[in-house]
Swiss-Prot record:
Cofactor(s) it depends on: Mg(2+); Mn(2+)
Gene name linked to the record: purD
List of residues binding Mg(2+): 290, 292
Cofactor note: Binds 1 Mg(2+) or Mn(2+) ion per subunit.
Source organism per UniProt: Leptospira interrogans serogroup Icterohaemorrhagiae serovar Lai (strain 56601)
E.C. designation(s): 6.3.4.13
UniProt keyword annotations, A-Z: ATP-binding, Ligase, Magnesium, Manganese, Metal-binding, Nucleotide-binding, Purine biosynthesis
Region forming the signal peptide: none
Metal-binding recorded as keyword: yes
UniProt lineage: Bacteria, Pseudomonadati, Spirochaetota, Spirochaetia, Leptospirales
One biological process term in Gene Ontology: 'de novo' IMP biosynthetic process
Gene3D superfamilies (UniProt xref): 3.40.50.20, ATP-grasp fold, A domain, ATP-grasp fold, B domain, Phosphoribosylglycinamide synthetase, C-terminal domain
Name of this protein: Phosphoribosylamine--glycine ligase
Reactions catalysed according to its record: 5-phospho-beta-D-ribosylamine + glycine + ATP = N(1)-(5-phospho-beta-D-ribosyl)glycinamide + ADP + phosphate + H(+)
InterPro entries reported in the protein's UniProt record: ATP-grasp, ATP_grasp_subdomain_1, PreATP-grasp_dom_sf, PRibGlycinamid_synth_ATP-grasp, PRibGlycinamide_synth, PRibGlycinamide_synth_C-dom, PRibGlycinamide_synth_C_sf, PRibGlycinamide_synth_CS
Biological pathway: Purine metabolism; IMP biosynthesis via de novo pathway; N(1)-(5-phospho-D-ribosyl)glycinamide from 5-phospho-alpha-D-ribose 1-diphosphate: step 2/2
């Protein structure tokens, strides 16, 4: 490809820091702008904080008319569910990310489950409720453990794996009565508990063709040994050995092929990234836990470390309908990301923690900012997940060792991290 591209990246997390890091390496990049960004981005890449409102169509379109871009890469799910890709398409600007119809696959658990039923995609049995009393009645007839999910977006925290009836009842009360997730809890999906190992697989699609990135395994629970509350993710590694070649074939044939076919049939070819969160049963059968309409975080940070090629070219081709025949070259070895989080995360957590960060240059380690901000040249925490430390090496053990030895050099009071990331594959 002989084009030079001015790119706008939307988002502020570790995922966006990683995407930006690999976009900068592209020979196709003429200029990168980021909105709203975080404390790790160079000032010249950041748009002013009042540039536009990312969930407001008029605001977005008026900004884009005055500031044209060749490609927009949308990191988080909220703008996609709101219609960001549709708004940019009206101005003929390519977007890496699906339209608002397709983005409902993450925006509504009920929508996703109904699509899976229609496409005969393997997933847990479920029922959707809009009335508290009906959900409680249904719960009585079910065995434990059972999974309670708020229907709408809840930043990865709307799911409870209930190990007792009381826990399930509390989860339903919090969603329906206490409005813990606001309108995202107007409906609740109750589904059967699935046994097995989880894995994440990302597919990049141009609406017609698609290819898969290497599988990763995320660690959702806050504490070592998979204890504690669910979080947005405390670390991940890639590739995930639980996904063998034969399982990968099943994932393509039973999950991605029928899903992309169904979107085309509905008149909405899926352009962008479709993330399948999978449960692999003990006998090697993949089932879908959830779909997301964007790169996962933190998995993206280690998956992109394994890509051997031009990320910008891949994203631009996907956004302009030109990925037929393209394959993502993958490095040998393994990569890991470990998340440094604020004490108290995922509930009420410390903020404004001063961060003293060592240099990473000359090492196979990258430090990706997430919940950080810059004040007077110094970096402070601003979110629950503060940093992602990524290492890529000859094998998982060497990558894990590098990541943890770097983490020990970071001076940040009132923070914590899991010390067992990758344990299932070590």
């Amino acid at each position: 490809m002989q084009v030079k591209l001015k790119v706008l990246l939307i988002g502020s997390g570790g995922r966006e820091s990683a995407i930006a890091f690999y976009l900068r390496k592209s020979v196709l990049l003429s200029e990168l702008k980021v909105f709203p960004g975080n404390g790790g981005f160079p000032d010249q890449e950041l748009l002013p904080p009042d540039s536009f409102q990312v969930l407001d169509k008029n605001s977005v379109q008026s900004f884009l008319k005055q500031n044209p871009f060749d490609l927009i890469v949308v990191g988080p799910e909220d703008p996609l569910v709101a219609g960001f890709a549709d708004w940019a398409a009206e101005l003929n600007i390519p977007v890496f990310g699906p339209d608002s119809f397709c983005a409902q696959v993450e925006g509504s658990k009920d929508f996703a489950k109904s699509l899976m039923t229609e496409a005969k995609i393997p997933t847990a049995e479920y029922k959707t409720f809009s009335e508290y009393s009906d959900s409680l009645k249904y719960l009585e007839s079910k065995s434990i453990p059972i999974v309670i999910k708020a229907d709408g977006l809840a930043a990865g925290k709307g799911v409870t794996v209930a190990t007792s009836k009381e826990m399930a009842q509390t989860a339903l009360k919090e969603i329906f009565k206490d409005k813990k997730f606001g309108s995202s809890g107007n409906q609740v999906v109750i589904e059967e508990f699935m046994e097995g190992q989880e894995a994440s697989i990302f597919a990049i699609s141009d609406g017609d063709s698609y290819f898969l990135l290497p599988a990763a395994q995320d660690h959702k629970r806050a504490f070592d040994g998979d204890q504690g509350p669910n979080t947005g993710g405390m670390g991940a590694y890639c590739p995930a050995p639980v996904i063998s070649e034969s399982i990968l074939q099943k994932v393509k044939e039973q999950i991605f092929d029928p899903m992309f076919d169904l979107f085309r049939k509905k008149g909405h070819p899926y352009r962008g990234l479709l993330y399948a969160g999978l449960m692999i049963s003990p006998n090697g059968e993949p089932k879908v836990v959830e779909f997301n309409c964007r790169f996962g975080d933190p998995e993206t940070q280690c998956v992109l470390a394994m890509l051997d090629g031009d990320l910008l070219e891949l994203l631009y081709r996907a956004s302009t309908g030109k990925i037929k025949g393209v394959q993502a070259a993958v490095k040998k070895g393994a990569a890991v990301v470990v998340v440094l989080a604020a004490q108290g995360y995922p509930d009420f957590y410390e903020k404004n923690i001063p961060l003293n960060l060592p240099e990473t240059s000359g090492q196979n380690v990258h430090l990706f900012h997430a919940g950080t901000l810059k004040k007077d040249g110094k970096v402070f925490s601003s979110g629950g997940r503060i940093l992602g430390i990524v290492a890529q090496g000859a094998d998982l053990k060497s990558s894990v060792d590098q990541a943890y030895s770097f983490l020990e050099k970071i001076q940040a009071p009132k923070t914590f991290y899991r010390k067992d990331i990758g344990y299932r594959a070590l």
